[in-house]
From Swiss-Prot:
DNA-binding segment(s): 128-234
Subcellular location: Nucleus
Biased amino acid composition, Polar residues: 444-461, 511-523
Tissue distribution of the protein: Expressed in roots, culms, leaves and young panicles.
Gene that this polypeptide is encoded by: ARF13
Record-linked InterPro entries: ARF_dom, ARF_plant, B3_DNA-bd, DNA-bd_pseudobarrel_sf
Entry-linked CDD domains: B3_DNA (cd10017)
Name by which UniProt lists this protein: Auxin response factor 13
Organism domain of life: Eukaryota
Amino acid sequence: MARPPAATAPPPPPPPPPPPPPPIDRLVWLACAAPLSRIPVVGTQVSYFPEGHAEQCPAPLPDPLPSAHRFFLCTITAVDLSADTTTGEPYATISLLPLRHDAPAPAPAPAPAAAELAEAESQEFRYYAKQLTQSDANNGGGFSVPRLCADHIFPALNLDDDPPVQSLTMGDLQGDSWEFRHIYRGTPRRHLLTTGWSKFVNAKQLVAGDTVVFMWCGAPAPERKLLVGVRRAARYSGESACNARGRVQPQEVMEAVRLAAEQAAFRVTYYPRHGAGEFVVPRVEVDKGLTTPWRCGMQVRAQVMEAEDTRRLAWLNGTLTNLRHQQIWRTLEVEWDASAASSSMKNRFVNPWQVQPVDFPPLPMGLKISNNNISAPVCNGDSLLVPPILMHPQPQPPADIQGARHNNGHAYADIPSSSTPSMVRTQQLFPRDLQILVPHTDIVTPQNGSPPDNPVNTPLSASDGMKTIQLFGVTITSPVQGDTNGAFASAQVNQVPEGVDDETATEEASDTSLPDSLTNGHNQDGARL
């Protein structure tokens, strides 16, 4: 008689899922995120862009996205801030609920209450971020600590010791602790992290170009709690928008698009990296960008980090060269001006809500315009502040109306750009065939103020003389009208305050400070590229 087969043992139960990463504080998350990163606000209406979500993946999507699913109007229902368990990078898990595209726009959000602002300002929090050099990232080396970081983030050293040294304990975003030896030595003396630094570099797999962020929060020194975080530099190859160090899987993007198309709730993962556009964008910003009348030739600008000093922001100017009407995500193609900041611009394709059109620059101080004359400040070199009426070259007018002003409502499409929206170059502004004809007694034209290949012609009568003055070491010759006494009569020169130069004014107008050196973490909000 055959024996019945033995019962097979049931398969072992699957291992429990790993515990979710611990939540991190909002200020810590913003400090470790790329500059200009933002945290979406629960309850607001946003546009979700799957193509931007796909840029968070290390490889392209297996299938192209349907053309009907370019973006989805949604409401944010939850935002969870965490740190990656492998890399330590901050990321946000955003829960979204799709809306109909004809849903009415929400009312403007109320201003934060005074109590909320006071509570945010009262939090004791500072951080310092430094991009790693090749020496910092070398295995077996040390970390050169900027003095500002050592003085304001680390506890004070006893400079009477020889050498001054201390042990620092720092926690990371994953809850682990790290021990570093902080010493002040060398010729000239400098602050260094030695013992413990190589272990940290190897564990975090840091390379040159990544950024380390030192933070303290809570009570003042010596009871303050020290934290350390990292920012990962993106790795792009060629024209690909995919980041080789991306952490989002393509399947997550495809699943989010499927659920959004079915009007079902879904979640997305957002890593705030430099160069990756936000793909969950406030609706009001998208609506404004899509309703702007963009056209080729427009001058635009975007706020970016300086390439040589990531603690500072700069306005990067460019010219709109192409409109890709078949899509919404990165529909604008911009040719960026050559500048120090342009090296931080990784993609010439941008979104309409990431840039601003550049209108007429403001009138400079001291410039006077009347019906039949123009008087302008003396210019330095080839940089000149000019009024809008001179922005657009006009055909030579008939002889009977020479000297009249001709306005053009679309002149700003041809404004040359430079590091600041209000500064233009006379070589570009005044072509060879441009004649500016005005009464000879009403304008001062310094010979040293106009390049020789770009003349500004001012006819002189036989009775006119020449008057020279010396300003900041430059001899300036101006036409004047003689009188019976031979005295200087009608030439008008706008005076420059003593001790002021153009370089200072240009620097103040073009740059604003980015809080990567020492900040309380409250000014990270803003669009980024």
